[in-house]
Each structure stands twice: as structure tokens, then as C-alpha cells.
């Protein structure tokens, strides 16, 4: 990334949109001497073009410039490190949710219960939405897949392996490998 950043005009603000570990923007700024920001995007592989066009919110450093570029969007002012953590927190939670509902599906199957009825009852509460509760998932498989969740869970677990979140993610990753083989 440093090669690309160094080839850009010096007065060009640089926002990285892909998922990067917390602290990466700061390191890139220090290495290149440029202002490098992170502004995560929230895309689904199946609908990435529409998702990109209709991002509901924008957050990162230099929020005033972004208000001009993205008028009418919800703007949240935060550091790039906070934005980097938002993206990981979002994706890892999605993977946790998929894994949890796959476990509930598995229990329902073993107990002779109708998962769709149980799911509908759970979703009747306003605390949980239906995103990531479909079993099997949109790809027709169990567990989480795609390009983002597996790599993000692995990276987050590795980065925080000695922290409680790292300890939580190890069994999630193991369970997911069982579900994906299913």
C-alpha cells in the first residue's frame, strides 16, 4: 500500500475502504508522511454495487470534507483507528451471529423442532433483526463463508489471541469449520 500512497499527489487525502487492522492507517501515515484515513464500507458480496451506492453512514477523520463528498448521509466523527475497529467489530459480530443461529438450528433439528418457527419467535422481539439468521445461509451452506467473515475472524482472533475476544473467537472458528463441512 505504501507504494500506491507514495505515487499519489501530496495534497490528495487518502481514505482506505477495505478492512484493515486497527492502527494500520496510523502506521501508513507515519511511514509515508501522508494523511491516511480509514472509512469502512459495509457490503454484501451478492449486492456489493447497490450497497456501495447506498452506504447509510460515513465515518472517519476529516469529517467536514466527507460531508461535502457524501451529502445527506449520516456522519460520525471518529479517528481512523476507531473506524478500523468498527469494521472488525461489525464483521466479527456478523460471524458470531451466524454461528449462534447455526447452533440453534442444529439443536432444533436434534429436538425435532421447527427452526423457522423458533427463528420467527426470536425475531418477534425488537432486539434482534433477521440479518444473519437464515440457516442455511444465502449461499446454501451452513456457517459463515464469503471473503470477509472468515479472514476477519481469523485476523481478529490472531491479533487479540490473549484477550477475551480472542478466546471467544477460537471456538467460533472451530464451530464454523464443522458447519461448513456439514
Report residues per predicted region.
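Rossmann-fold dinucleotide-binding core
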Residues: 2, 6, 13-87, 156
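Short, hydrophobic/amphipathic alpha-helical packing segments
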Residues: 5, 98-101
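Alpha-helix boundary recognition
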Residues: 6-9, 123
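A short, structure-level motif marking secondary-structure boundaries and short turns
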Residues: 10, 88-90, 141-142
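Conserved active-site segment immediately N-terminal to the catalytic lysine
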Residues: 36, 90, 134
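Short-chain dehydrogenase/reductase
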Residues: 60, 90, 94-98, 146
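Interdomain hinge/lid region at the active-site interface
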Residues: 84, 102-182
Amino acid at each position: 500500500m505504501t507504494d500506491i500512497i507514495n505515487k499519489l499527489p501530496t495534497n490528495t487525502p487518502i481514505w482506505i475502504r477495505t478492512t484493515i487492522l486497527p492502527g494500520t492507517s496510523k502506521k501508513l501515515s507515519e511511514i509515508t508522511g501522508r494523511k491516511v484515513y480509514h472509512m469502512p464500507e459495509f457490503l454484501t458480496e451478492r449486492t456489493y454495487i447497490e450497497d456501495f451506492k447506498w452506504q447509510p453512514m460515513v465515518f472517519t477523520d476529516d469529517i467536514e470534507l466527507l460531508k461535502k463528498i457524501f451529502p445527506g448521509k449520516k456522519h460520525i466523527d471518529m479517528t481512523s483507528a476507531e473506524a478500523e475497529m468498527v469494521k472488525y467489530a461489525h464483521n466479527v459480530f456478523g460471524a458470531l451471529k451466524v454461528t449462534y443461529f447455526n447452533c440453534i438450528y442444529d439443536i432444533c433439528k436434534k429436538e425435532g423442532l421447527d427452526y423457522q418457527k423458533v427463528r420467527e419467535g426470536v425475531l418477534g422481539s425488537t432486539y434482534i433483526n433477521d440479518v444473519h439468521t437464515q440457516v442455511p445461509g444465502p449461499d446454501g451452506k451452513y456457517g459463515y463463508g464469503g471473503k470477509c467473515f472468515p479472514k476477519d475472524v481469523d485476523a481478529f482472533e490472531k491479533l487479540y489471541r490473549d484477550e477475551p475476544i480472542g478466546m471467544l473467537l477460537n471456538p467460533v472458528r472451530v464451530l464454523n469449520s464443522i458447519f461448513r463441512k456439514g
